[in-house]
Amino acid sequence: MTVILYCQYVWGMGHLFRSLELARALSDHHVILIAGGRGVDIELPEHVTLVRLPGLYMDEQFTTLMAEDANQSVDFVQHQRKVILMSLFQQYRPDVFMIELYPFGRTAFGFELQPLLDWIHMGRFGDIKVVCSLRDILVEKRKQEFYEERVIHMLHTYFDLLLVHSDEQLLTLDETFSRMNDIQIPVVYTGFVAQKANPTAGRQLRRELGIGSAEKLVVVSAGGGRSGYTLLNCILDAYPLMNRADSIRIEMFAGPFREPDEFEKLAAKAVDGIRLRHYTKRFLDYLS
């Protein structure tokens, strides 16, 4: 079976890594993972093919689309993306199309998703089952009633299944979506989807870093790096003031999307005992 999994991350990296874990779990199938944000160095299983769309992201207010390549207009990037998406479906004619968050979110990307869903609905690419991959908690909307009506209409028109990535004994969708009972397509709670840590990797990493058993390791992360500068800056200012600072090692990750000027300012404050980097593929090893 061929699965196309669409993930558009617009600020951080959490959506990307959740989608990557879903792709990893589909190990008996061929998965085409479509990523629409800025490139991040990730490890792909053999059964997963990564397709990067020309990057788009949202501004800090989440109101305006921005092109990752400042030399290209948003209109040009949008056209490129639509052409790529249509050609992928013509080439692969997948059995399943899984869309991360849409139609509950990512409505700014309706310019490419709506025409694609219309063509799928008309059978242009064969018989494709369409699945919504949904996070556990939704962001409240200013026009909640209108928003929920639109979501219900979209689900019933274009989608065959809703996957909710939550533990229903802890958190159910109706806590942030009042019309849960009006959803007529099947709804499945998958449990929380996250990377799995290697329980022995943390000790191995400490040995690699030369961190003794009496030395404390502090991991500081700002996620993707589009925000969090103030937090990182405060930690760098506070570190020299800490008691017994020589027994504390800080591994700081500013984020792969951090602006170069901000990274340079942080690097200028990184004294002995602090290592500053943009990103690591071994983040879970540091936490474990």
Predicted segments, located by residue:
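A short, glycine/small-residue-rich beta-strand->loop->alpha-helix junction that serves as a flexible
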Residues: L5-L20, G228-T230
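Conserved nucleotide-sugar phosphate-binding/catalytic loop shared by glycosyltransferases and other
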Residues: C7, A25-F76, Q80-S87, P256
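A short helix->loop->beta-strand "cap" motif at the edges of active sites that frequently abuts
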Residues: H29, R124-K129, F159, I185, ...
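Short loop/helix-cap segments at secondary-structure boundaries that form the rim of catalytic
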Residues: G39-H47, D174-I183, P260-A270, D285-L287
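Active-site regions of enzymes building and remodeling cell-envelope glycoconjugates
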Residues: P45-L56, D182-V193, A270-R277
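Conserved nucleotide-sugar donor-interacting segment of glycosyltransferase catalytic cores
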Residues: S87-H156, L170
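A nucleotide-sugar donor-handling region in carbohydrate enzymes
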Residues: L134-Y229, G255-P260
